[in-house]
Amino acid sequence: MKKILMMMTAVALVAVSCQKTPKITPVPVTVTLAMDGNAYAEEGVNVSLRDLNTSAAYEAKTDETGAATFNVLPGFYEATTQFKKADDGKAYVYNGVNSNITVVQTGENKFSIALAESVTNQIVMKELYNGGCTYKITNADGSDGGTKTFQNDSYVILYNNSDQPADASDICFGFVMPYNSNTTNKYLTDGKLMYDSLGWLPAGNAIWWFNTNVTIPPYSQIVVAIFSAIDHTATYPESVDLSKADYVMYDPEAGFNHAKYSAPSANIPESNYLQTAPYSKGNAWSMSVSSPAFMIFKHDNPNGLSTDSANYDLTSGANAPCVKVPVASVVDAVEVFTEGADDKNKKRFTSAVDAGYIHLSNKLGHTLYRNVDKEATEAIEGNKEKLVYNYAGGTTPNEKSSTDPSGIDAEASIKNGARIIYLDTNNSSKDFHQRKVSSLK
């Protein structure tokens, strides 16, 4: 009888104990995006909520107000998000984390994630070829006729350095005076560029712009022929084939000479001919073949910029006006120095545009090629096994030793299906190296 009473008492105690323990059930939790202390409304952003005790993770997308809703058990959580947006040629990356989320059974479970924004240019110059090549001459009798130089085969490659489509429609091309890095710079006084604090750069001779809408897909490129878009290798084997370029700087109304601007290949539609309106004397676009300060920038009315004398600066002379290009509009730039002339080389870009420079040994078929961002490229999901290492395409010590410090062979990796993210630090000394052979070869 005593045993029966003890059992009944134990059952009763358990019953009482169960009644005192509240039932734990999932509760609604709202996590909203915030920027600078204010709500940030962005629909479709993926938010992750991770249980700090069990590591269980939950995913939800934000609604039109920027709020993501979950149903989880009470406990301690961490909310994170990362997303990207593209606008006006720039890539915006947003990151946010809140590690102090305590979800309770009763009460208002509303939390926020403070976003941090970083901005990079979507569009970068992947490669600039402007120094030309040297070719051998064979005399009629078969004897060696020496060598000559061919330099009417320049091009630039624009690359979408992001995973979002890039609008390049408003991109313009120009160079800052003087033409060469080792010549007298009228803008330089006591070691300082007179326009350093004025918010503009002096673009010489002319600027070029697209004549159609241009969209560059993610991790893709377009080739823009600066001079004749034909197969130069047919005459000069050491040169490049630009007959398959995507776009070409060709505007017959500009009055530029035929030697540099022969009729483009039929592969290139007329809609892909760039336009220009020269504002300085000359029968060709005078971009340097040794050391240009080359830039791409955005402008919604480049023809007006070129033809309105109110935009001109005459420091280089009355016959050589320069257009004042706003520094804020510059998308990318590369300062090229003449090889072997460091006692005379001078910067033309301000440090805000390009804090460094890259040497070019011209006439040898070399190009200036952008270095790979190793960490970012390896971090792309599924990318690492497709990357090709032990890059050996830089120039050798008998010229100016130069290579990509990442060790990644970008072109071989692309052919292997990898996606490449290139360095963009606004410092050509870090961002570029001299490549022995054009990537188009």
Model-identified regions with their sequence ranges:
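Intrinsically disordered, low-complexity linkers and terminal tails enriched in Ser/Thr/Pro/Gly
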Residues: 19-28, 34-42, 52-54, 62-65, ...
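Sec-dependent signal peptide hydrophobic core
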Residues: 5-9
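Positively charged n-region of N-terminal signal peptides that target proteins for export
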Residues: 1-4, 19-20
